[in-house]
Amino acid sequence: NLQHKVSAAFSEYRAAQKEPGTTSVGQRLELWNKSIELFKTAPIIGHGTGSAKTLLTRDIPKRTGSPANAIGNPHNQTLLFAIQWGLLGVLALYAMWSVHLLTFRGEGIIAWIGLVAVVQNILSSLFNSHLSDFYQGWLYVLAVGIAAGTITKTAYPQGVSAVLSLNRS
């Protein structure tokens, strides 16, 4: 249950304070700290697409002697974007989420489905990089796209282009 998971996470956090990287929470904290340091070295435009894995794993064999522990993902969507695309990427991510949230501010079941998809993605992105994972990324795209398309079709039954051409006349 949730209480057990939260309690276990705090226990792992305390263990990680004593010996970093030995628990799942400890590894995440280590990855987050390293991600912040990487962001500081290229804060505006980042290190480039696909650079996170290389940058996050380049010191692993030196420290542990084994590349098996290499994790090339900070398990945080904001940090992943910050490493790869800097502040510009983070602003683009937050702008996307903001537009999606505004899209689903209306009433009705479709708006609620879209809103739940966006909020779930934002919250889960604190502890993972779902937009970059194949299944979760496509699920988000499909859920938001279908819900937004349905809302648009309901609002403009004759089509958006027809409404735009009528407004020009």
Give the predicted meaning of each segment.
Residues N1, S165-S169:
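Signature aromatic-anchored transmembrane alpha helix within multi-pass, membrane-resident enzymes
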